[in-house]
């Protein structure tokens, strides 16, 4: 009989743990979506290395020796 109670208790604990983990992963997903919406996509103009290009991209370009191209960087 104790075995059955222990089994039921283990199932309930596992179900509650899964619900908590699902809520945390959903929260992380919402944060990631907000970040992706605010980041600069590939080919988008940026001004400096610290600008928030999307993951895997960097703010590159802009030739300081060319007056026409100075400060025109893009997320690549």
Curated annotation (Swiss-Prot):
Intrachain disulfide bonds: none
UniProtKB keywords: Calcium channel impairing toxin, Disulfide bond, Ion channel impairing toxin, Neurotoxin, Secreted, Signal, Toxin, Voltage-gated calcium channel impairing toxin
Signal peptide (UniProt feature, chain positions): 1-22
Molecular function GO labels: calcium channel regulator activity; toxin activity
Domain of life, source organism: Eukaryota
Expression across tissues: Expressed by the venom gland.
PTM statement from Swiss-Prot or TrEMBL: Contains 3 disulfide bonds.
Key word Secreted present: yes
GO cellular component: a single term: extracellular region
Subcellular compartments: Secreted
Statement: the UniProt record of this protein carries the keyword Transcription: no
Protein function: Inhibits voltage-gated calcium channel (Cav) currents.
Family: Belongs to the scoloptoxin-13 family.
Descriptive protein name: Omega-scoloptoxin(13)-Ssm2b
Organism name: Scolopendra mutilans (Chinese red-headed centipede)
Lineage start: Eukaryota, Metazoa, Ecdysozoa, Arthropoda, Myriapoda
């Amino acid at each position: 009989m104790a075995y059955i109670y222990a089994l039921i208790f283990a199932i309930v604990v596992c179900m509650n743990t899964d619900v908590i983990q699902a809520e945390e992963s959903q929260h992380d997903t919402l944060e990631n979506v907000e970040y992706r919406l605010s980041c600069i996509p590939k080919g988008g103009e940026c001004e400096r290395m610290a600008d928030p290009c999307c993951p895997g991209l960097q703010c590159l370009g802009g030739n300081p020796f060319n007056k026409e191209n100075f400060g025109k960087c893009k997320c690549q």
